[in-house]
């Protein structure tokens, strides 16, 4: 009996040589009456219209083409089941042995900011997933292909043993169910967002494999990198690597942290990160000036770190960065001179990525047996309920330093204290179990630079001891959420030492 293949694709990459290979092997080609059929016929391939198989025309602007027993009976009939064969023969249904289908471009449609809700709905494929699932269910007899990357393997299997062919069909069927599940999850997520349902009764997220990593945080841990189907151009997932070795698990985490911090700034800025915490942040009139300040913030910790910048890297800045060992540099662009300088260092990774704030994403965190989901911490200085509870108000210079510290401290692991002047961080205390301990670390790191600096705290002071430590170090201004039952202690201490203190009403815990 002549084998038959039903072909209907939106992605025509590699299609013609693949279908020619099937046809040369004696496979009869069926297709719907759209672009796929035209492309095949223009390539000289004989094609049978699906309407001739079903005896029914395409209707409803093409919404119904293949939803017919002559198609699904041919896909689902088990070749080893005599009753199945008898039934399809009595009904004049012929088996279909290959299904080559990929789906309407729903992801691409919703990624287009100009696409309407109606456009999205029209790009929900119905017939395609139905054929894929029928074929995948009956993979004992049917070869189903959803990915052009598998075309060569299918052609090669034509001369393989039955066992090898079955193994390939099983592999392809598993891919199909993953693919259709991801497709449906994406549609479900889009419609859920459209109706504003915040916590649906079930949550399905879908990502595509981007990279198998050498290992995870440590060499004994296996790891991989997956990309959201709706990732932003301003994301590590869409960063373009211009130079260097493959990114590691830790590189990706740290680069993501650096990118999210540098997005906080509209002026030229540079951020150095180690272990997902900033070790130095600088701003300036130029990106070179900003990098110099980020480096000077902590020249020891930046070694082997990740640096993110929000302006093009020029020759002068590249020369400065080339003077030390850095794992990753990411920026919106690199001048040709800068690339030539940095590419001389074989171990450095250069990433080109848009540095703009995009749409807010949900933050996911896995716990054993479950998943936590929350909104991004997107609130900035202007989003708070700003008030000054102390007798003295900040000077203009102090306001500049306080705002810089507030931008940075939300990205530091709690308990977090950040000391700044108006141009750079001078001390960072991260991840401490008590706030006064975090302040002590930041103050020690700052040394003499604590004199006249501003202090930012991610959460309120439970006692007045942190204010007292700040005063003794010469800090003149503080920004914190406020809200402690003992706020009066901190306010009294600040007034005692002439410190200007700002309450924002916004907490920035980070775990």
Curated annotation (Swiss-Prot):
Signal peptide: none annotated. The keyword Hydrolase applies. SMART domains: AICARFT_IMPCHas, MGS. PROSITE patterns: MGS. Residues 1-146 form the MGS-like domain. GO terms for biological process: 'de novo' IMP biosynthetic process. NCBIfam families: PRK00881.1, purH. Belongs to the PurH family. This is Bifunctional purine biosynthesis protein PurH. It comes from Shouchella clausii (strain KSM-K16) (Alkalihalobacillus clausii). The lineage of its organism: Bacteria, Bacillati, Bacillota, Bacilli, Bacillales.
